[in-house]
Amino acid sequence: VKPGRHFEPGPIFHCRSLAALLSEASLCVSASLREYSISILLGLLSVTSVSAQTWDTGGYLKYRFQYASYPSDSYTSFLAGSSTADNALAFRYNLGVRHKGWDAWADYQFQALYGDTIEFSRDIPDLPVLPDRLPDDDHRLFDLTHVITDVDKRAALHRLDRLSAGYTTDQTVIRFGRQAISWGNGMIFTPMDFFNPFDPAAIDKEYKTGDDMLYGQYLQSNGNDLQGVWVIRRDDYGNVTSEVDSIALKYHGFVSDAEYDILAARHFEDLTLGGGAIFNLGGGVLRGDLMLTATADDTVFSGVASYSYSWVWWNKNISGVAEVFYNGFGQPNGDYSPESLAENEDLIERIARGELFTLGREYLALSAMIEMTPLWILTPNAFINLSDGSALVQVVSQHDIAQDWQILLAANLPIGSRGTEYGGIETGIEVGGEPTYLSTNWSFTFQLAWYF
């Protein structure tokens, strides 16, 4: 389990295991989802005559291998041994059609997993600081995910990550269905982007997970715009209720060479106000967001500010960013004991919903994107918890090896003593009378992607 909650099961495909899994997947595809997908495609075809349509297609096929090493007092070490090896195969096909102002989109995903993590994660207790083992739509309006198989070391599923229809004019956009939006000015930490944000330490940030929502935008003649969303969800009992939905408005404007954002939202049952700005400073860009959330018990402040700058060093183009983040929902004084975390319901709820990925309050993130060659980008990152002194050091290497082919390599090294966020928080579970931790020695990831 990687500190910071980024936990992506991914599998070890022996050729025979992969062939068996794909064969099983082809035989077990859900009839209901298959029929639903066919009806979507027929609906897209019926938008208008074929000659008048504009079609957009694309996608990828990705293979990922992940290896992780664990210390002897890690709870994962007790379940799976001193190391885990996992592989994942991911296929995505994006289909869109446009006619005059109308458009419709359907993005299909298939994932096949084989490895140690899929197997041992079934035995992990329901810890709120860990994400779901597999993607699901339990709390979304539409259930567009079907798990084909989940047994032993293998799992497979398919889903529709986008499914929406919309209408666009010169000044307005209206769209309903499964889609994704990104708000806020944070480069690494994103407190204003509370709709399925990326984990700051995620290696592949190509697609956000979609949510079922009604989205609208009005563009003014001066370039300013107003966006509004209504994200519709189901509660734990499957009921559609306003207690778990989100309604938000965000105004984006320009003043001279600066930009600003103003946000007002009701997210679940909390009221949120926010503001952000971007402007040039000293040859670089200064940006940030401030958020104020009124919960049932308190008013919580969060904020992020970053400075990015580009330069040339040793004939290499470099773009660097330094970002500070204050998480008002985080644990004070670096106390991450199970008892203390259990008392912080606001934090635990946001981690469980995938809105936050940090346990503490004060953070510093440093990142530099170095263009080693036009086809090789090297990115060292550091995520530092200023409250407890722990950190996660990460190096990502991106290689464009051929037309439409890309390799990603990444190494993660957590630093910190036991009881700290990145050094390993205590699970509250004892093995042989000794405490266990959510800790990792180091991990390595390899990903090969083909785009079409």
PLM segments and residue spans:
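Transmembrane beta-strand segments of Gram-negative outer membrane beta-barrel proteins
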Residues: 53-79, 104-106, 224
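Transmembrane beta-barrel strands of outer-membrane/channel proteins
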Residues: 59-67, 106-112, 176-178, 228-232, ...
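Residues that define the transmembrane beta-barrel architecture of outer-membrane proteins
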Residues: 83-91, 156-161, 168, 208-212, ...
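Residues on the lipid-exposed face of transmembrane beta-strands in outer-membrane beta-barrel proteins
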Residues: 91-97, 162-167, 214-218, 249-253, ...
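Outer membrane beta-barrel
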Residues: 98-226, 231, 416
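Repeated loop/turn-to-beta-strand initiation elements of outer-membrane beta-barrel proteins
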Residues: 101-104, 171-174, 223-226, 255-262, ...
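Detector for outer-membrane/organellar transmembrane beta-barrel domains
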Residues: 284-383
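Outer-membrane beta-barrel "beta-signal"
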Residues: 436-452
